[in-house]
Amino acid sequence: NPLSYPYEVYKNDKDAAYDLIEDMCKNIYYDKSNDDPFWNNMASSFISGLVASLFTFGKEDEINFNSINALLSHDGKLLKNFVMAKFSSNSYVSTMTMPTISSTSDTRASILSVAREPFCPLVSRKRLSMLLSNSSFSYKDIVSKPTAIFFISKEDDVRVNSLISIFIRQLYM
């Protein structure tokens, strides 16, 4: 579960967790061939805010990509009301989500479309979704004990390669 390590960090150091969340989201939405990074950058910031809101109010077993995908199914008005009711205007969650939530309906729809795109293949495939919903290891154990890790994936599977990159980056942070 790519969110499990940032969530563990969040319990003791919110700022460090926000760095991990932002790094993960930038990795998910990075597209070197994109001439207009605005949409991916906005989607990345928005998802960073949703993840932080999930860390604040979600139960531990809800901290996963399936929950983020479920949050993305809500309309802008519901999300805006939730953020405004639960978070101060200068909170991390508000700072990251309000630019999208408060934008015009066409702009918001475009950002949400970009935000949803990478999650569809991750949550629509049952085995992958289950794999990404929990962690069977501790990052602390991996870095403190001799450990071998094997990744088996298709070379051209950009989404899975992105997840592998996120995993490796989290090990070094």
Where are these regions (language model features)?
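P-loop NTPase motor domains
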Residues: 1-173
